[in-house]
Amino acid sequence: GIPVSVGGGNGMCESVGAGVAQDGAYYMSLDTAAWIAGQSKEPFFDPQRRLGHICTLDGRSFSVFGAMRCAGKCVNWAQKLFEVGSPRAFDAAASNIPAGADGLIFLPYLEGERSPVYDEQAQGVFFGMTQQHRREHFLRAVLEGVGCGLSQILDVLRERGEILDLRIIGGGAKSKVWKQIIADLCEVRLHDVTTLSDSAATLGAAAAAGVGIGLFD
């Protein structure tokens, strides 16, 4: 018959696919939602509910993480709302606006939020609007708003120790403009993984299957 191996959830498999296998290593998943996660020998209990933890795929350690409900979902929403033809056109428009979007700020809470403040009722906001703001400003503000949310998560994770480098996976990792915005806001170096950025979870699941059939340890 066909051998069946026990796998894991999306976050468990993505950690393996991103190559995060040692204590203190971190990665960022930038997709419809987003999170930053790092491996830890011990579980992390946060009474303020800013972070969570799950077991790693091998069950030997833990993945400590903070997550945003809407990341790429905000970009997709803005792309439709402002009738932007493609992700490439979105990036081109946003890159023509200076950092800070001339004072226009976006809060990316289109479906509530998880980290660092868990609030099901949180709502998205554009504020600081003036007559000088054009469509391009709103697009830039969306990218920066998500970046600021990720920076808040990283600030909490840094209470556990210094974080200077992050591997990045997910569909959002294809955007050079967005990655630069996030790197600047989070003050980190972002490293693309060698596998396809949006296939990390699949790679992790394949690794679990390989271990299950004895292909490798």
Residues covered by each model-derived region:
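Active-site core segments that coordinate phosphate-bearing ligands/cofactors
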Residues: 1-169, 173-217
